[in-house]
Regions:
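Post-His helix in hydrolase/transferase enzymes
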Residues: 85-99
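Short alpha-helix in the alpha/beta-hydrolase fold that links the catalytic acid
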Residues: 57-67
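Short beta-strand/loop motif that positions the catalytic acidic residue
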Residues: 42-43, 47-50, 54
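Active-site nucleophile loop of the alpha/beta-hydrolase fold
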Residues: 6, 25-35, 51-53
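Hydrolases whose catalytic domains are alpha/beta-hydrolase-1, hotdog thioesterase
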Residues: 12-16, 35
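Acidic catalytic loop of the alpha/beta-hydrolase fold
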Residues: 52-57, 82-83
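Gly/Ala-rich beta-loop-alpha elbow adjacent to hydrolase catalytic centers
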Residues: 4-13
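Catalytic histidine neighborhood in serine/cysteine hydrolases
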Residues: 67-83
């Protein structure tokens, strides 16, 4: 099982742990719904796709926030904002690279 989510749904996805989960893939996580994210301490892989110019949690800020998380990669989509208008292909490519 791969757990995925976008924006606040990404926050919910990162709050879930279960033995059936193989990895997490999130797009534009805001990291503001909860004070603690269960996935942060989990050794299974996490990929957080971030917009460089996200209005709610810019990529640089997100990278700092998850620096201590286990087995976590942040993929930055340059030129994109929280809604990834015109940058959807970059999301598809990032997810494809993770799943390849």
């Amino acid at each position: 099982v791969i757990v995925a989510g976008y924006s606040f749904g990404a926050d919910v996805a990162l709050s879930v742990t279960d033995s059936r989960i193989s990895r997490w893939i999130t797009v534009a996580p805001v990291l503001s719904i909860f004070t603690e994210f269960a996935a942060a301490h989990d050794a299974r892989p996490k990929t957080l796709i971030a917009a460089a110019h996200d209005q709610f949690r810019p990529a640089a800020e997100l990278s700092s926030a998850v620096e201590a998380w286990r087995n976590t990669d942040v993929v930055v989509v340059e030129g994109a904002d929280h809604f990834f208008h015109g940058a959807q292909r970059a999301i598809v490519d990032a997810i494809g690279a993770v799943l390849a």
